[in-house]
């Protein structure tokens, strides 16, 4: 009824020169069309030429960090991750967008923390991610592990009650800010450390015990890595693989998902990079210490599928993966991790280098 009122009030009326409306969601659809098709819509999935105004841009955050003497790298880890694309003169321009309220709170307080729950509550997120749609739980777990999930945003009805599939739920989470949408490849991801904490808060009060156990155990697993305790690392990865049923292996990519979830706590100290470019290929996983944690060792992890962990270490050395970390002057750990199909066990070999 309200949409009918707006349409009758605004559509094709001579007395309306311009109407400007704001809201969290795009206008409700009737079938595949907007109920108010006289509006041009700007949204998180299609910001058009307004992309740079959806939040703070990276340059604006850098200026704020300089003004308030805050660490930009920490601001990036906590509040970046939203990728908005505008098309200017037939050229795509991508903006890294930051959550404004959280950035302001961090600048004024000097503390990088989760300010999300001052305006939203994880209870709202919890309602959506535990809906009974095929593949929804799997997608959330994979995104916690750092995966990008393909999505079709075209079926979303632009409301908070009508859902036909997991894609509709995930599209809503994009509009609510719980996911970042990559327009270039039509995928979604959890944008940053702040929002990831909201997922953990929500899951901790649900029956996803296997995920919470893995996240809680990841702190000790990271310590075992630092201590070069390959056996403990291998056993910890075994446990994550056994507990989380979606992590079925068929290649090194699926092994990578397990590793990222097993070392979830690494994000507390590191920028975690998948497939870091090197002189002779790509290192599978790299942990690069943020400036605030420069005392932590950098880590290069090479993954093998049904081979030998020692062979992974050899590949790191042969392909000179460490060259990509030449600007890091602390300790460097090399970790080779292999999964044996016959024994269904992981093995881990860890070596230490001084750059």
Enumerate the predicted regions with their spans.
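Short secondary-structure junctions
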Residues: 263-271, 327-329
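Basic, amphipathic alpha-helical patches used to engage nucleic acids or provide basic targeting signals
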Residues: 309-329
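Domain-level recognition of nuclease-like catalytic cores that cleave nucleotide substrates
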Residues: 324, 328-355
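Phosphate-binding site recognition
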Residues: 1-249, 266-269
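Switch/connector loops and helix/strand junctions flanking conserved nucleotide-binding motifs
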Residues: 28-34, 309-312, 342-349
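Conserved catalytic cores of phosphodiester-cleaving nucleases, focusing on short active-site segments
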Residues: 259, 283-287, 296-307, 319
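Active-site metal-binding core of divalent-cation-utilizing nuclease and nuclease-like domains
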Residues: 267-294
